[in-house]
A protein has these predicted regions:
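Conserved alpha-helical scaffold segments that buttress catalytic/binding sites
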Residues: 3-245, 249-352
């Protein structure tokens, strides 16, 4: 179980999918035809699609089910329909219940307040967690997401644009991957997504020319291909348990191009999940070790590489002798920089 067993869940009610989608013969997705969650045999599913905003969610479905889903016939996916009660508590409660069943929920048309409520409920059940936010502006982070952060071990901000930030919006708990750093090399995002429990994708992070339905109409931001790539990285994350996708404006594009992009983002998230090769990083016998000694410092950093997936980690120094060292995700480039005695700041944070 992911969460404390004493936590009591109120099973949510759904508005089942329209027959327009449920009658589709060309998709491996199972469609919910029940209003009560307890009428479903949920344990057999791996991924659940959930509509939070019913109008947006059905627009998304029109595009998603037009894509080639044959790639996912080996996966167990269910479209639960649209939630009846979209209060912050009920949405977060639904996500936590599905996560307890080891089902990854993908929420369409969600809000940051839902994400915040999930953080609060994780803290209530004493669950350490790591969250990620894809957004152009860190000021969108709700104050509650930063408060009560004893159990929020790490918070990653991805795609942030420097010119939109104020100095007080950069909180010490947040690890930032600026848009410019992400664009230098796409794989820079991989350590940020590897250990994330849940991610919120703010569609305002996508530039207006690629996504005209954003609320901000920002001329700069992620390209559409980058948005899909980020979702694929989240899907392939070893610990990813939930994906929230924000709401958007519907009147900007009668052709449905915006909804098609969101459908593609979800498609690549599912592909990432299907293709991932989970590495049991706690079992070092399955990893190749590389020892790097920093000259004139006495510092030794142990790196590990999985020969299965090519993923890299470095070993956090022992703090408590009663516990084994923690392996922190990193990139091959960070390993090479360390070998050349140019230790990245992100690694130095763990050594100091």
């Amino acid at each position: 179980m992911y969460f404390c067993e004493k936590y009591s869940y109120m099973l949510p009610e759904f508005l089942p999918c329209s027959s327009l989608f449920a009658d589709s013969k060309c998709t491996p997705v199972h469609f919910n035809k029940h209003e009560k969650m307890h009428d479903l045999e949920l344990q057999k599913y791996e991924i659940a699609l959930i509509g939070v905003n019913p109008i947006l969610s059905d627009l998304f479905r029109h595009k998603f089910y037009s894509l080639s889903l044959d790639h996912f016939r080996m996966l167990s996916i269910i479209d639960l329909g649209n939630l009846k009660d979209v209060s912050d508590f009920n949405v977060a409660n639904t996500v936590m219940h599905l996560m307890d069943l080891k089902i990854i929920p993908i929420l369409i048309g969600s809000s940051l307040s839902h994400f915040t409520q999930m953080h609060l409920q994780c803290s209530q059940v004493l669950m350490p967690h790591r969250f990620a936010l894809v957004s152009d502006n860190m000021s969108r982070i709700d104050d509650l997401l930063i408060s009560h952060s004893m159990f929020l071990k790490e918070f990653y901000s991805i795609g942030v644009q420097r010119h939109l930030q104020t100095s007080d919006s950069i909180h010490s708990i947040s690890k930032i991957l600026y848009l410019s750093e992400f664009r230098k090399k796409l794989s820079n995002i991989e350590p940020f997504t590897r250990n994330v429990d849940a991610a919120f994708f703010d569609l305002n992070a996508i530039r207006h020319s690629d996504f005209s339905a954003s609320y901000n109409s920002n001329p700069s931001g992620l390209f559409s291909e980058e948005a899909s790539s980020i979702c694929k990285y989240f899907g392939s994350g070893d610990k990813t348990k939930a994906l929230f996708i924000s709401s958007w404006k519907t009147e900007q594009d009668a052709s449905g191009t915006n909804e098609l992009l969101i459908a593609q983002m979800v498609w690549y998230f599912i592909e990432g999940y299907g293709l991932k090769k989970t590495d049991h990083s706690n079992h070092k016998k399955n990893l190749t070790q590389y020892i790097v000694e920093i000259k004139n410092t006495g510092i030794q950093i142990n790196f590990y590489k999985s020969e299965i997936s090519g993923k890299w980690w470095f070993e956090e120094p022992i703090i408590d002798m009663d516990h084994s060292n923690v392996l922190i995700p990193c990139t091959y480039d960070e390993y090479l920089n360390t070998v050349q005695e140019q230790v990245p700041d992100r690694i130095l944070e763990y050594l100091n």
